[in-house]
Curated annotation (Swiss-Prot):
EC number(s) on file: 2.7.1.130
Role according to the record: Transfers the gamma-phosphate of ATP to the 4'-position of a tetraacyldisaccharide 1-phosphate intermediate (termed DS-1-P) to form tetraacyldisaccharide 1,4'-bis-phosphate (lipid IVA).
Catalytic activity: a lipid A disaccharide + ATP = a lipid IVA + ADP + H(+)
Family note: Belongs to the LpxK family.
Annotated binding of ATP, by residue: I66, A67, G68, G69, A70, G71, K72, T73
Pathway membership: Glycolipid biosynthesis; lipid IV(A) biosynthesis; lipid IV(A) from (3R)-3-hydroxytetradecanoyl-[acyl-carrier-protein] and UDP-N-acetyl-alpha-D-glucosamine: step 6/6
Protein name (record): Tetraacyldisaccharide 4'-kinase
GO molecular function: ATP binding; tetraacyldisaccharide 4'-kinase activity
């Protein structure tokens, strides 16, 4: 499976995060400094000098405590669909990481990722619910409710460390790496100490240490791809052909592995590009006539120059016990408003 991957420095650091080896130990003093800075950030809230903004409706925070992708966006999509199907009117707020703008704005299915961020652009296209972005999430919530008065529950995407927005439910998502070596950045992958109190833990690999209810996520790729023209193709139709795959996500190797193992595709080339890559200078490694496959997040940017690329969605399944817990918590929050 020829192709390029993350920079050697990034690969080395991620490898170091799995163990408490020489490199991780050398970085440990910086982790102690990082922990002190975290404490200073939280102190005004702990002492009551700063207060979290109140949304006025239930807020579900989806986040993680590890650096890099953990699968938050598929969880946010699954939540939005479940809530909508359960009679709620959800809305989504996000910071909009990587965008060229800095204001509070709505992300629509037509929004460019450069204007709202990659994840909000995907959420706006795929969720069917209103999405707003702002650096201060409470501003996004206020704008969301002002324009969409029917919204009665908010999902905050990647908001676990954003203390300025009060929350009722916290969901912490873990990928296959779990907590790695258990150390804080940069000696380890943790953005904050773990374990910490949360409503529930959602994990793709082994369950991390926690006292919270924990639920295993089942992830798989969709069985078909879609291009910029809305045409669809079963991935099975690509078997036996040389396929080029590209991914600009936190863990591109996971996407490539699933294409090969789940869909039995022969990846002639696999390009792993930096997360949030803009694709303006993207060049194919293979022949133009060979199928080009990409992640759902990358599709809108790639389609500007390669509309024939096949976007493959990541599908997520969560156990019934998780949905029962979520519904129970939300009903308890809804009763006072009945």
């Amino acid at each position: 499976m020829p192709g390029n991957g993350p920079a050697p420095a990034a690969r080395g650091l991620r490898a170091a995060w799995r163990h408490r080896g020489p490199l991780a130990c050398a970085l440990l003093p910086l982790s102690l400094l990082y922990r002190a800075l975290l404490g200073l950030h939280r102190l005004p809230y702990a002492l009551g000098f700063r207060r979290a903004g109140q949304a006025g409706i239930p807020v579900i925070v989806v986040g993680n405590v590890i650096a890099g992708g953990a699968g938050k966006t598929p969880v946010t999509l699954a939540l939005a669909r479940h809530l909508r199907d359960s009679g709620w009117s959800p809305g989504i707020v996000s910071r909009g990481y990587g965008r060229s703008t800095d204001d509070c704005r709505e992300a629509t299915p037509e929004s460019a990722p450069a204007d709202v961020g990659d994840e909000p652009a995907l959420l706006a296209r795929a969720s069917g619910v209103p999405v707003f972005v702002a650096r201060k999430r409470i501003e996004a919530v206020q704008a969301l409710r002002a324009r969409h008065s029917q919204v009665d529950v908010v999902i905050s995407d990647d908001g676990l460390q954003h203390l300025a927005l009060a929350r009722d439910i916290e969901l912490c998502v873990f990928n296959d790496d779990g907590i790695g070596n258990g150390w804080l950045l940069p000696a380890g992958p943790l953005r904050e100490p773990w374990p910490r109190p949360v409503t529930a833990v959602l994990h793709a690999g082994a369950c991390p240490p926690t006292d919270a209810p924990a639920f295993a996520m089942q992830r798989q790729l969709a069985a078909e791809g879609v291009n910029a023209h809305g045409e669809r193709i079963p991935l099975a139709a690509l078997r036996g052909r040389p396929v080029e795959a590209v991914a600009a996500v936190a863990r591109p190797e996971g996407f490539f592995s699933m294409l090969a193992s789940e869909q039995d595709l022969a990846l002639e080339h696999a390009q792993a590009l930096p997360d949030h890559y803009n694709f303006e200078s993207f060049q194919r490694l293979g022949r133009n006539e060979d199928p080009l496959v990409c992640t759902e997040k990358d599709a809108v940017k790639l389609w500007r120059t390669h509309p024939q690329a096949w976007s493959v969605a990541l599908q997520l399944q969560l156990p019934p016990d998780f949905w029962a817990l979520l519904d129970q918590r939300l009903q308890a929050l809804r009763r006072p408003r009945a």
